[in-house]
């Protein structure tokens, strides 16, 4: 490999883009040193060449310089080897061959006479004349500005003078000219006085001035300046008590307001803060703690365990600051820090493998931050988004710079920062942000209206980003290092055309550019040198490293006195290479030596190299950051491992052996534990030896050039390059196949053996398609299906031999059978509005063409592709337009229009017509033209326009093409055809009719049988769901992700892997193992000669079914999918609309709303002639709710673009889907030998999000009665109970309950744990509950309405010996225990005053009974700590305050009655108790009388009451059952409506959602309160599911109960051991953690706010005919149809062993009645028929009930929930004859002709008669003749099997008869309504 790259003088245009390439001249101010009479070969010419070589070496220090030299009127290339230690006289000038083709742009021209033409490739030439005269520098402005040209000339003059008469080394020449010195004096910034101070003083001052103004707005809360100052002072006092003054205190925290509190506290305590990154390995963090000899560390609770070390105290900081309150009084008030004290210790990469600590003083940071704030225009209005890690020094500038000006610091969470940066910036209304360019590239300025200023640093910024952002806001480029306190250069206010490489000027003195190898020499302006920084804001140095400090912080060189007469103490060497522009600004060039930055992270290559060598044991290693030839930055490790070493003469790169692979695997596992991820090499390159320089150092230049000459794919392949196989005997046929495969895969033929798999070798579907014609040219008859079925060489060879021996003949295209286009030309011409003679041919459309036309008719503009061709001045426009005309003439599909022929369906007419060129002023105008005159039936489907410039000259050629005549595969083919025509090459005719012929010959019966079998019993779930029936998706948003694949070789294609992974994602998100999604095939596998080069729409969309089998091996599942895809190939052209008509199952399968498209890499090359105009045009190509377009960029990268409808999917949710897809793809690549069920879709992003949603939860240390007693003591006279039978104050509640507790203790003759309470609703219930607690017992509320046997069973289970009862129920109590305590008889009487026991918080508080599967109720046990922890969370969430008056409505058998009492008392509120008659007969009056303002109710109860009757009620929380949308609409405008969820086993309430609106999803049960909510596999709770997946909810945390009393087996089943995955989310001991399996199916809300959607019970999924039903949705539509006097329930029932959807309807009753079934009278039938008709017009057929049962009243359970079991029993008790009377209408199949009993069969007028006949014509054809009598005029078109294609056909036919409606009207209106839209 030739590594010589020539020499290119750098572009010095001062950051400006200049096109001028004319020659300009600047004269040199130096005379010829000697006479030129000795000619151009003389000594002077040699000296001039040497001077020129030194100049080139000065500006681009490259050891080998090359330039052109004129000799004998010919330009030759000369080169010279340069070395700084070399004497200039020893430089050897070597003359090479011609300079043509060499990469040189400078030259030396010494001519005899006259001017000599200078080649345009030479941009800088030294010109002299042998005949005498001076020298001049000829330059082109596109290389040098005039100022820089003068600088170069002055430098050359200085060099030439230095050579006169002296023998000096190159390095000793001072090349700094007088002009340069003048410029540097001008550039130097005058010193100015800067403020000195301490950082913590900033906050103290602002706290006084701005007090309650918000200082920090964080994801975890807000802090005012006063709060920030107070909290940090409080913590500082505690830190002083630990004697930390003068020490380093590491801080380990994620983004949080508390991190800033901790920083300030450390500073106020007189210590120095040392931020650590918690994402780094534990070993690295602990080594930093040891290096700084820390006595204490501060961490958030989540990361405290990372820093647990002997002798180091861990201080946990967070919202709970109570631990610090105990230390407010420090031993003595220590003085605050001095401005010369150390403030921060920041860690950066070190060269030895260990990190290095940079010491920053208060004053350095204070000055730097003050200047930073001023330069970025910070003010009190600034809302600064804190993006960078706390370990970056610039984070200090953001934090303290913002706070110093009184602004607001906006703090996102780690998850927001990494996964939803746009959302975080928008939510926090940030006005300023410091970002890396990588992060900026992911944002769109249009999405961030509040953002006014962005500063970019850390890595280079592209021109594209500058252009995108500079027009919208103030864009600044910053530069700085940790050693310079975060920054030292700013380039503010970039223009859209500004140069992002320009770092700007210093605002604090000063910066200098010295020679990288000799800082005692400054470099000329424009030359590359090392940046030196001086000033008061420099760091002290490096922690405990005097040697490194001395090397980087140097004393001022001697040249400093020329520019700084005052004292400069030291400078910092940055190791960064830069150059001056002529205006004094500095431009970045690169990193010096071994330091680099990658993705904004600063790295030390020696550190990484040291770690790699350590991990690789005996291997030699060199690590370099290289940029590949395809411009990909890769951290690359070059390795020589044991067993691969060889002599230096051997090829440098060698094939990897087993030892190399094992070494790399082991190294990666070690590096991932010891280095941050960005410091782990991306690729390892196997070498035979390390190349060396002359000084025996690793020749890194050679290694970099070696890697930079390769692409990313080339480097990656080096790790897995297949080894040559042993030469095995091959048959002649196998040898042919071997050659074909070698040609396609670029793998040497000798490396391909008979057992090799085509797909192992990199084959894919595209290469398989290209293999077919290649094989045909070699005489082999092959199909794409053959390649997939027989992927191994020997298998394919055997198959072809068998085919040949049997004389098999492949089918070829046949003419379209029995179709004469002649009769239809006139009809086609009429529909097209053209002359019949212009019609060349008419033939049928493919199913794809039909479907695309139908879909675009529903959504104007859909499936239209816009393309553009740039017209450069060099293009001959006339010739180009003629080329296009030639192609259109040769390719009939480009002249095709689509029409509909009566009784024959859709056909395509080829029209003999020329291109009609339009002229437009903008692309938007062209789009508007196409919108006003859409591409549709009868119109041109390919349109052309010329875009005119401001001068009315054509600047672009525009095309609009309908996808019914064009597909993606055709794009490069069309480009090639136009290019051929433009170059005068012939364009071969192409006939799409051949493909149509092939499709028409496929036997329809066989095709339909295939799809019927393929989709039999299909049970798919539509994803994403549509917001309403008949909704037409409009994908207007997109999201993108790159998937990086692990290196692997598998036997299947990338497409197959993506399909399996997408199926897994869909399965998780739908909760269905039977998945169907849309898949797109190229259609290029058809047996049509030349199909691979045919321009036309051959692609096909099919329903792709995947049945997930968790027990199958991944490799087997992949192979099965690939086999399915191969089997499907002959049947893929049937068309979705036709497949849907085959059966009910196929129709359901074709109802998918997500489409997967995989574009395999195409090796045919690309052209710049045609390109997609913009992303919006891509959005117009799709009509599904979600389309996933995946493009395989190379063997280890896939670009995934998701196009989606924002009304169906949230943008953040789509990103979750893409993350999970990427995670699944990586897993099946990395571990293909696992089982499908072992693949986890829980992505790292999911894990981070779940961690954030489930933070640590505090556990209460108090009992419930202790908490209530605090309220009693705080508010003794406040009303605690307001009851129908009297009122009780908190003092009375406390005293009465204590007295009663003593009596309980006295009466308990034997130990008892449980005390049942048998009371009617009364004020005494509260007293008894509290008394039982104080007595150390657990209460059990009994419902007195229960049968005595049930009550006896409960008491028996609990071994109860004492019952507290009221007088009313004394008789029943006597039957339960022998000696009950009658409360109202003894309350207030003198009694014993016994010492009450001390109750532990873990003691049982109460037991509540739930129904059990065995018929025996289960007693759930809840402790004080469990309920108290839950109450501390749900009380503030539900807004329960001392002013809250809670209605006590729930039955005592329902645990809601407990929350009504206890949580109210704990908050200091009042419980309002109604009597039973008030509760049932006069609820509104009683609530008003007691002024109740809060209620916990079930949704069923709210359906019986009117919000207007409850004016005092301002808060309502619904719980206990699923909420309907109707409840939200009725109540949300009247009260603060909330929804809660919680099983009895989890302290009543586990989730709560406040403040519902009419836009709220009724399924959303809110976020976890006092617990963690996890979604697990319903069949395996040890498997945590990804975000968005449907799974079982398990609850973990302190609210989880103790289990079931006396039922260990049931307890074990419901409260299982803690799953292993929980340890990933807990830092502490898990022995006390409990989890509860709810049995409820949920999924996280797509809004990704941590809330949950309730799906249903695990054991009763509601599905009917393969469709999941939301019963509440059907109920919602039914309620909206009926007046308010009705009650209804929709339920799935089973009758005659068949499931059916039933609607139970009842009139509202004033008083309870027994529930029973009523007869179906004519009146009932009339009501229900009207209701059914309305539902049928709004809902899909499967959601319309078929069984309609009138009943007396909707039954309720004792807990006031709808009793659905009773309804199912009512239906089940019906006889077969009775059941038939309640079937209002039979369900409709997809087959046309089925009628409903209520349908009107006789049209009323002529319009209806005509329309009825037109409908009949639409259904005449392959489905047979449809009876007119079976076409209902008051029914929907879809009722008789109509679909979108039929709607388009009807629209076309009806238009000819005067009807004016759209395809959308047909799908959404009744036929009678359509008939009225006729204009006669």
From Swiss-Prot:
Residues 205-594 are annotated as: Adenylation 1. GO terms for molecular function: ligase activity; non-ribosomal peptide synthetase activity; phosphopantetheine binding. Residues 728-804 form the Carrier domain. SUPFAM superfamilies: Acetyl-CoA synthetase-like, ACP-like, CoA-dependent acyltransferases. It is an enzyme of class 6 (ligase). Pfam families: AMP-binding, Condensation, PP-binding. Keywords: Ligase, Phosphopantetheine, Phosphoprotein, Repeat, Virulence. GO terms for biological process: amino acid activation for nonribosomal peptide biosynthetic process; ochratoxin A biosynthetic process; secondary metabolic process. Residues 1269-1665 are annotated as: Adenylation 2. The modification O-(pantetheine 4'-phosphoryl)serine is found at residue 765. It catalyses: 7-carboxymellein + L-phenylalanine + ATP = ochratoxin B + ADP + phosphate + H(+). The keyword tRNA processing does not apply. Pathway: Mycotoxin biosynthesis. Its EC number is 6.3.2.-. Residues 840-1250 are annotated as: Condensation. GO terms for cellular component: cytoplasm. NRP synthetases are composed of discrete domains (adenylation (A), thiolation (T) or peptidyl carrier protein (PCP) and condensation (C) domains) which when grouped together are referred to as a single module. Each module is responsible for the recognition (via the A domain) and incorporation of a single amino acid into the growing peptide product. Thus, an NRP synthetase is generally composed of one or more modules and can terminate in a thioesterase domain (TE) that releases the newly synthesized peptide from the enzyme. Nonribosomal peptide synthetase; part of the gene cluster that mediates the biosynthesis of ochratoxin A (OTA), a mycotoxin composed of a chlorinated type I polyketide dihydroisocoumarin moiety linked to L-phenylalanine, and demonstrated to have nephrotoxic, immunotoxic, genotoxic, neurotoxic, and teratogenic properties. OtaB is responsible for the linking of phenylalanine to the dihydroisocoumarin ring. This is Nonribosomal peptide synthetase otaB. It comes from Aspergillus niger (strain ATCC MYA-4892 / CBS 513.88 / FGSC A1513).
